[in-house]
Amino acid sequence: MNPPITDMAALGRQLRCPEGALAQEVADYIFASNEYMIRQTIDRLFLTSGERILEVGFGNGGHLPYLFAQGDNLHYTGIERSEEMLLRAREQYMSLIEQGKAVFLKATEGAMPRLPEEAFEVFFSVNTYYFIQDLRGYFERLYPMLTHGGRLSLGYIDKDFGERMPFTKEVFTFYTNEQIGQWLLEVGFSSFGISSYTEEIFSKNGRTVTRPFHIAMAIK
């Protein structure tokens, strides 16, 4: 699937926060490009029935049926900075909202909404950390929201690969696995580990590209 925007700088800004007339097309492009990574990140959570899940950056929400198929009586809280994506999710998944199985919240700029302590057993996010200015501080604010033994799963593309992409020059910041692990451990997480993968994707000119990505996992 080709990106709906040919201006790479503009595409990068839309990947950060889909908005305007192209928001839906951009969000669908993001999901199509990242579905495998999203599913792998969810799989690393090893969800069990009744768990409460927090996700930052749910995009078009196309992965939620897969997520809810992982266990019974799951409860999902999704946080998203894009107003268009928030409205789409609330409309598309109204039945989950009405059943008390899902909540969709608006993120403030670069900050985690205030949520109760020990409210979630699991947290995951895919391709979002690049846009957070103070990532260590973000992990620090997230930590109290997880229960004791709570699990974190963070999916992201490899730093060297990401920095070579034409759309990452403005609003993206990449870190090494070691830096991410150091920050997670500093704020209190333990049992940090990395799983690394590759997948074949299509570039904007139709060529096949091997994209390396990682999933960072940690336990409170």
Locations of regions flagged by a protein language model:
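Core SAM-dependent methyltransferase catalytic element
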Residues: 190, 200-220
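Conserved SAM-binding loop and adjacent beta-strand
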Residues: 22-42
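A short glycine-rich, Lys/Arg-flanked "PGG" loop and its adjoining helix->strand segment in the class I
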Residues: 136-148
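A short SAM/SAH-binding and catalytic strip from SAM-dependent methyltransferases
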Residues: 121-134
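Conserved class I S-adenosyl-L-methionine
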Residues: 151-181
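Class I SAM-dependent methyltransferase SAM/SAH-binding core
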Residues: 54-111
